[in-house]
Amino acid sequence: DAHDLTNIMPWSTEESIKASLRERLNNTKVFIILIGEKTKFHHKFVRWEIEQAIKKGLPIIAVNLNGKRYHDDDLCPSILDTELAVHVSFNQKIISKALSEWESLHNQYKREGKTGPFRYNQDAYTALEL
């Protein structure tokens, strides 16, 4: 868990927080963002962290806490509207599937020039009994 590498304290400066987040991103293979009611409006660090993940070419898994299985226009930060990312519901089975498959799919789609939000179809959820 990259978030266990360093502690961010309430009195940390913006520069030290970004340095810590950068270190965490340097030690990850997949970027997971939890999409909740307020995620879209957290511009200072959430947007910056997404920008860094995009610059690094990290595969992005967007997890909708509200259970939606697709890109949620109302809650997802707009920076992800056209970025290559898979959007899934907040469920361990589908998140595990995304963690095991999305990195290679992301790389394949990048080579093919594909962008935009992706999602698993109903068959994938049904196969997981969801």
PLM regions and their residue ranges:
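Conserved beta-strand-loop-alpha-helix hinge of the TIR/SEFIR fold
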Residues: R24-Q52, L58-R69
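Active-site donor-binding loop signature of nucleotide-sugar glycosyltransferases
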Residues: A2, L65, F90
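C-terminal interaction surface of TIR/SEFIR-family domains
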Residues: R69-L130
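Conserved BB-loop
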Residues: D1-L21, G36-H43
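A broadly tuned preference for mixed-charge, low-complexity surface segments
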Residues: I17-F31, L80-S89
